[in-house]
Amino acid sequence: MKIIRTLFLLLIAVYGSSVVAKPMLKATFSSTTMYYGIGPNSDKSIVAEVTIATPEGVYYGSWNLSGHRKGETLTADSWSGPEPAPKVVLKDFDNTVSRSACKNLPSNWRGCGSFTLEITVQSDDYGCPWLASSHIVATTFITNETYSPPDTRSSVCPKVPVDTFDISWDANVSKQKTTLMLDATGGTVNRTLHTYLMEGGKLCDGSKFDNRGAYCRFVSSGITLNVLGCDQSSVTTSAVDHPITDVELHDINVAVNTRNIGSGQFTSTCSFQYIIDEL
């Protein structure tokens, strides 16, 4: 199940003069397929990054996939959580995958590939939800360009319904439309807004390490943001992800070129689409 939410930003510019380790239980995901980009020349490094989110902590690890054979167990390059680190075994690979499998792959990259991994993580014994999220970061030679597709999410916990979750411009109330007032300076004016995850009309705060916070992190790890653009070419927007342990979901950066606004009032509407994916 997927829930789609849309946020609207009305922009108005007016001309003016101014860890504690606990016993762990094993959980194995025997066939996790992750995609990676094949760079313009070749890839200097191909690294699998895994995030384990539990009710009491969020841990990060990385494993280098380059130069390994099928059946090999990969050694963790880094792991921030309690030992042992997740065990990662290379089961298969394919460098002839359709480009469509690599979402938003740069046009100058040659193609898309995949690795199939067996990932054994340490599930906590103090209850659900916990979640393993993983993706591959490919880095090219010469330019050091990087590409990473969306996360692959895995869990053995019961499904978390997402129909009561929403996205808001305001941390205090569910708000899908907002207005940003700007003074035109004759140059480019920059502003940053934030978005928040709401549940039942209240802030869902992933920075809280309690039962509600654990579910907030679980759901926010499956959220995709599409920046749909603005109806005026002089306005541009971009989004920056926050970690799932932050209060905010995204920073929405707004840049307005006020050079040709002149006197009077200028308005523009920008749209952002959120997809909340159920796991």
UniProtKB/Swiss-Prot annotation:
To E.coli YfcO. Keywords: Signal. The keyword Signal applies. Residues 1-21 form the signal peptide. This is Uncharacterized protein YadU.
